[in-house]
Amino acid sequence: MGLLSKFMSALIGEPYTPKPVSQSAPKPVQQQTTQRRATAAQPRQTQQTRQLAQPAQSPQLAQSQYRAQTQTTAHCTSSTTNRSRSTTNRSRAQYRSNSQSTQKLMLQPMLPAEQIERVRNIIGKIEKHELSDEQISAIAGAGHNTLVLAGAGTGKTTTIVGYITWLLSTGTATPEEILVLSFTKASADEMSSRITQSTGKVIRACTFHSLGLEICRSSTIDNRPIIDGHTSNNVVRNAFEYLLEHNVSYRLLAFKLMSQQLLDKYSAAAQLENFQLPTDDYAFNQYRQNLIDAAQTIIQHMRSNNIDTAGMQTLNERYGGKNIGRNREMLQLIEPLYHAYVQNFATNNGIDFPGMIVDAISCVNNGSYRHPYKYVLIDEYQDMSRPRYELIRALRLQHDFSLFCVGDDWQSIYRFAGSDLHLILDFDRIWRAWGPTRMFQITTTRRFRQSLIDASGAFVMRDTNLYVKHLHNPSDKKDYSLKALGGHTEEERFNVIVEQLRKLPKTASVLLLGRYRSDINLMIRCNQNGLFSIDQSTGNIRFLEKPDMDIRFMTAHASKGLQRDFVFLLCCSGGLKGFPSTIPEEPLLGLLLPEVERCPHAEERRLFYVAMTRCKKKLFFIVDQTRPSRFMYELHNKICPNIFRGVKLPPQCPNCGEALSLRHNRSDPNRSFYGCTGFPSCRYTQQAK
């Protein structure tokens, strides 16, 4: 293993004993706003949170305060340990919205008709289409800090291209003074291409990590190697496997964290030095992989938030709550893996992907990088994370620029990757120190029909913390575009899918959506007659009766930004891996992520909304009639009951929202009762009539 083997030899030259974790922790411009309809959550506060909660102040004061706070970390390539140590004291990982009631921006009115027409004449058509009045108003009415809330299918990218065209056409900025930031390379490349085709100019459009890499390399050594995620994950995996095989105390701790059953089963044998790992035990292999995945994810978030194991101990002691003990054990397991990870890129003077933005912030703070931008545009702003926010903030403190952000709070679905919804909900509070903040909405969509717009909007807006938006389709077709299809068994649900596919046009484009990748198993297990050719690796599915039909399976997360004629939502069931998913979060990881929202299943609701809005013509809910999703009950009872004709739902548990199932009394077979399908988490029962 080369470097890794040398490092691990030094690390475990003697029997490894987890170190005990310490039991104690070391000691902008006024804008019109409107109160949120419901009281915001009361999250825990940190120094960073309190700073954001302060009243608006001048950019000069904000700049001096921020530089004073970050002075200890103003370096780019020096000791990772020192950087992490200073960061620990500031708890950078713990961004939480402030405990005061969040105030939301007032929607700006549209510009007068004559002004809109003048602006439209200057901009012209964008990608062969005229911009809407809402888009023109957002472009010409933009302030120093602008948030454009653009719903699904309303033309977010077109608005960004139009704004750049406006800046160039009016001579407000040159191409070199404009930066466009996106979250994926594919979207950044598409943005760059569309801007060039529309304006004839080359505008810098890149991801946050690409910008971070550019900053790091321009500030230090051009050829610093990138330590890719595959290599980093292998370092963590190899270190874990080595310790698991060669260290008794580490092995016992790992078994305990995997499962109490595994610990009971192997605890005696695991204390032997020549213990052989039970690799033929399915449960062991499954738990081991889950533990490795959790460790890799936690370490990546530690790096992206610039916090080390000592900082994690501090966070756990302050905010671990009932999970403090379990988190301590997880930290003991992760500590040597984290050191192996850090040593791997530090020895090679490399740049790891999770730490790329952290290093870039240091380069900006110490002045080794100077940016040339007057206008920065951010696409998909709802996906902003705390490290990305801090990079933008550091750039503005160095040399201010106008900020133009386009996003949709209804489609914020990446908390597990660090995205923080409060960065869009608290836009005014966060950015008003730099100047006036303004908000516009774009609500006209032609992607899907009004019936789906109304149902999906009513569904997502049951979370009252989100901005109110009223999307509409000007074509206003009256045909209903939602339908629930049910089945009590997998075979029944498979058959209703086949029946509907036979009714669709032979060249239709179709998405089969799941909450998890494993949801494709419905199609695989029931495909006994060979009706489909299924490629699990790509998700491509060929319906042999209609070979020209374009069918693809993917998860709801992966479908964001896509659209197809017809969508089948396969996972309308309850349970741990249902929709909403109720799989508990790793508590140690939760310390590194934004605060969980008070609205139950808030992000799962937004993810369900994203899944609903992928179709252009018709959406089919494939309902498990033995254990329907609680979202199905919500649609059935409160939003669109008419789509459930022919699909009867079982009674719903009033305690937890899961389905009730009819059961027979063991002592008296003639007596029956309803029990919650969420048992043992929910023990609700009621007598059957």
Question: For each predicted feature, which ranges?
Answer:
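P-loop NTPase Walker
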Residues: L3-L4, M8, R83-R85, R90-N233, ...
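Accessory N-terminal region flanking or inserted into the helicase ATPase core
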Residues: N98, Q103-T154, T158-T159, E177-L179, ...
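Inter-lobe coupling/hinge region of RecA-like P-loop helicase motors
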Residues: G124-S132, I136-A152, R224-P225, P436-R446, ...
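Conserved RecA-like ASCE P-loop NTPase motor core of nucleic-acid helicases/translocases
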Residues: A173-K185, I203, V406, F440-T444, ...
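Conserved RecA-like helicase ATPase core segment
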Residues: R386-D479
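Conserved helicase C-terminal RecA-like lobe
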Residues: P505-S509, D550, M554-T613, K617-I622
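Short cysteine-rich clusters marking metal-coordination/redox-active sites
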Residues: C653-C656, C676
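Short metal-binding segments enriched for Cys and/or His
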Residues: G678-K689
